[in-house]
Amino acid sequence: MRKLSSLVCGAGAGLAAFYLSRLRDPQKAAHSSWTNSEKPVDACGLWDSNWDCRDPRLMVRPLKNTQPEEENRFNADLEKAKPKKARHIILVRHGEYLDVGESDATHHLTERGRKQAQFTGQRLSELGIQWDKVIASTMVRAQETADIILKEIKYDKEKVVNCVYLREGAPIPPQPPVGHWKPEASQFYRDGARIEAAFRRYFHRAYPDQDKESYTLIVGHGNVIRYFVCRALQFPPEGWLRISINHASITWLTISPSGNVSIKYLGDSGFMPVQYLTNRIPRDAKNVV
């Protein structure tokens, strides 16, 4: 009987150790009712810690050997290369505008769009943020939105960076496809490279010498912002069109020193009265999309 008891205890301990080792396997997902517990996490579901190509371990001279002096040198260099503070990137979509005329020069904000921008500027002012940088798309509707916001947040217009890379466009063919919006393949080819370049320019972890958390305000466009959100969170970028954000809404992303990215707001417009909540061009405008 004692032998049988020992055998059962030993088998139980071995089984427990087996399941514990499986739980610790980094390739296993946290299981929900719809997942297959025997299937490893798909590669696209794993976080790429070097998404911005600024992993500190890859920014320093690698170890030549395992001597203590060399290891001390490597660790000292690594510590110097590590970011210390977070970067906050706040994205604001332009206000409602009229798609009138054949060029961007005639696409001005509506009266409601101007009021939306004012509400957003007031909201940003209430947050009490000290802005390190303000960047705006060069398109008229984004410029007009930025001008209104600048007055509310008391930011010098001369310091604003105007960026052509942030102009509206077709970032990547959406999945699932939609029938009402079908740009030519050449437009995706042209716009996609530009918008991706904008993402790489503005989205990265802090530099090692940054000694305080930084706040960057970007005033841009719906397609660009939605693509940025998918890219920053490492969601499939083809899903950008499944997201809807209102005019003059606020999206807030934070890049931590480790390179991890989190989202605080997505298309926040709850600070506006309900009659100012819009996300499409007015019906009486030309080329409604």
Curated annotation (Swiss-Prot):
Subcellular location per the Swiss-Prot or TrEMBL entry: Mitochondrion outer membrane
Membrane topology: Single-pass membrane protein
Top-level EC class: hydrolase
GO CC entries: mitochondrial outer membrane
Catalysis: reaction(s): O-phospho-L-seryl-[protein] + H2O = L-seryl-[protein] + phosphate; O-phospho-L-threonyl-[protein] + H2O = L-threonyl-[protein] + phosphate
Source superkingdom: Eukaryota
Listed transmembrane segments: 7-23
SMART domains per record: PGAM
Listed GO biological process terms: positive regulation of mitochondrial fission; positive regulation of mitochondrial fusion; protein dephosphorylation; response to anesthetic; response to heat
EC code: 3.1.3.16
GO molecular function, one term: phosphoprotein phosphatase activity
The entry's keywords: Hydrolase, Membrane, Mitochondrion, Mitochondrion outer membrane, Transmembrane, Transmembrane helix
Primary localisation category: mitochondrion
Entry's family note: Belongs to the phosphoglycerate mutase family. BPG-dependent PGAM subfamily.
Subunit annotation: Interacts with Pk92B/ASK1.
Record's function text: Displays phosphatase activity for serine/threonine residues, and dephosphorylates and activates Pk92B kinase. Has apparently no phosphoglycerate mutase activity.
UniProt-recorded name of the protein: Serine/threonine-protein phosphatase Pgam5, mitochondrial
Protein source organism: Drosophila ananassae
